[in-house]
Amino acid sequence: MAGTAAHPEGITNPPIDELLEATDSKYSLVIYAAKRARQINAYYSQLGEGLLEYVGPLVETTNAQEKPLSIALREINAGLLTHETVADSLPPVS
């Protein structure tokens, strides 16, 4: 079968192993990326209203259809974001 090879994007680019180096665990990576993706989504939603409360993508978007999560993962991989681990504020369960 002739044709061009697919160039997958999203969770396969950047590789998950590189993304895990930026966080303590895969769970914190999920939270980290999801929060940033929500900020990017809110930014795009606000553009039509003239409000600029959120910061837009920090990496160049190559495709107008690129999902906010893919953008967030590329930002994390590029080292453009920082995050802090906050101690639980809930008292221990007895």
From Swiss-Prot:
InterPro entries: DNA-dir_RNA_pol_omega, Pol_omega/Rpo6/RPB6, RPB6/omega-like_sf. One of its GO terms (molecular function) is DNA-directed RNA polymerase activity. Keywords: DNA-directed RNA polymerase, Nucleotidyltransferase, Transcription, Transferase. It comes from the Bacteria. One of its GO terms (cellular component) is DNA-directed RNA polymerase complex. Pfam families: RNA_pol_Rpb6 (PF01192). Coiled coil: none annotated. SMART domains: RNA_pol_Rpb6. One of its GO terms (biological process) is DNA-templated transcription. Its EC number is 2.7.7.6. It catalyses: RNA(n) + a ribonucleoside 5'-triphosphate = RNA(n+1) + diphosphate. The keyword Magnesium does not apply. Belongs to the RNA polymerase subunit omega family. The RNAP catalytic core consists of 2 alpha, 1 beta, 1 beta' and 1 omega subunit. When a sigma factor is associated with the core the holoenzyme is formed, which can initiate transcription. Promotes RNA polymerase assembly. Latches the N- and C-terminal regions of the beta' subunit thereby facilitating its interaction with the beta and alpha subunits. This is DNA-directed RNA polymerase subunit omega. It comes from Frankia casuarinae (strain DSM 45818 / CECT 9043 / HFP020203 / CcI3). The lineage of its organism: Bacteria, Bacillati, Actinomycetota, Actinomycetes, Frankiales.
